[in-house]
Amino acid sequence: VNVKERHFDFSRDLTKTLEADDSILEKYLLRRGDCLITLTGSRGKRDYGFVAMVGNQNNYLLNQRVAALRFDQSVALPEFFQYYLASPSYRDMFFGYETGNVGQGNVGIKALLDPYVILPDIDTQKRIIEDVEDRLSVCDSIEQTVDTALQQAEAMRQSILKDAFEGRL
């Protein structure tokens, strides 16, 4: 599964395992609420460090170069950390740990363990999550409006060109 910002991309073929030892499943089976963050990409391009939270996806195993963060949900809500780990300030810090050769960039687990995070109480986390989701919903709506307008502009452009080359202008 490809981890993208706030979602998973299931469009590529997945590696399937028919059988797995119980010890493997215990260690690598993803659970609802796990936050995944990608640790490898192109050096200097920030094309990794993407965060998504496991929801209703079942029977997926953690892959190499992806970290899974699991929280005691009586203290820390995964949704809160999904948004925190995607924030510009965290991403700047995260990429400060980047190593690797000319082409490939890597960030190790130290980037996830070193930072000191001020953790608000659960009610405050819930309010922050709600506020972020409300604002992201507005962004999604604007993005949909822009996409629709671009499609309409392209259709109009094609119509104008058709009319021009059929002598109707």
Where are the regions that the model predicts?
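A short glycine-rich beta-alpha junction/loop motif
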Residues: 59-67, 76-79, 99-123
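Sequence-specific dsDNA recognition surfaces
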Residues: 2-36
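Short, charged beta-turn/beta-strand-edge "cap" motif at the junction between a beta-strand
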Residues: 41-46
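Short, solvent-exposed loop/turn positions at domain surfaces
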Residues: 23-24, 101, 144-147
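Glycine- and charge-enriched low-complexity intrinsically disordered segments
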Residues: 72-74, 78-89
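Amphipathic alpha-helical coiled-coil/heptad-repeat segments
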Residues: 92, 114-169
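Short, compositionally biased
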Residues: 48-64
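Short amphipathic beta-strand starts and helix->beta connectors
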Residues: 53-54, 97-101
